[in-house]
Amino acid sequence: MKKLFALLAAGLLAVMSGCGGQTASNESKSSAQEPVELHVSAAASLTDVMNEIGKDYEAEHPNVKVVFNYGSSGALQQAIENGGDADLFFSAAQKQMNALEKAGLLADGTRKDLLQNEVVLIVPKEGGKDISSFDQLTSDTLTHVALGEPKGVPVGQYSEEILTKLGILDAIKAKAVYGSDVRQVLAWVASGESDAGLVYATDAAISSDVRVVAKAPAGTHKDIIYPAAILKDSKHLDTAKDFLAFVSNDKNKERFAKYGFEVK
């Protein structure tokens, strides 16, 4: 009788253990599929390509929603410093990323140089003034020259470097109008509100309403590097790491190249 009781007890324990293991397994599986809202702050010049990448990532990870916040790198940096919700930051310049790193806001070992770009001079495709070089920006025939705001907009900082190196910055200051990000500069030229503007080559490439008349001469500005990093306070560190790796895969390297970026 004692032997029979022991056998029955052992069997019951095995069944209970099996159920417990199954429950734990189900809980683990359920946890892995919990909804995740990944917040990505990215430079405005990355809007089109990152929207494509985000859709692909969501298709492969149905439990993840990628929420993008686009703007000037300077404005995004300030928002992050002020506690804004961001898991990753894609900047159009090292300056803003350096500031966040110095403040201790980046997750250790996650910063990487992702892309490279260049600055070009654009004019409206139709009905624009007849200019073909940076030097002609000083002409009295031009009323407005669109630039990025130099304090917080990387393309504005690069533009000032270029115009200073060419010795024409002071000559065009009276006609300069400053956009809050590179897409505003592009829009002003595309609409004809500005006679010319300085934007990234990748932004000029997506508009059928502007034409490129000159590239910034070599040596007139710092290399235009786009760094990326995960924020230390990310609520979804594992997903953020996975997304950053996804952005850098071979398929997306080709996608960046399609938009005119040089992949690092």
Regions of interest found by a model, annotated:
Residues 1-24:
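Sec-dependent N-terminal signal peptides of Gram-positive bacterial secreted proteins and lipoproteins
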Residues 8, 97-105, 111-115:
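N-terminal hydrophobic signal/anchor transmembrane helix of membrane proteins
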Residues 19-55, 74, 78-82, 93-94, ...:
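Exported/periplasmic ABC-transporter solute-binding proteins
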Residues 38, 64-66, 119:
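Conserved beta-strand core positions
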Residues 55-67:
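Signal peptide-proximal N-terminal region
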Residues 65-66, 109-110, 213:
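A short linear hydrophobic-aromatic micro-motif
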Residues 70:
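Conserved strand-loop elements at the edges of beta-sheets that form or border functional pockets
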Residues 87-91:
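Periplasmic-binding protein-like
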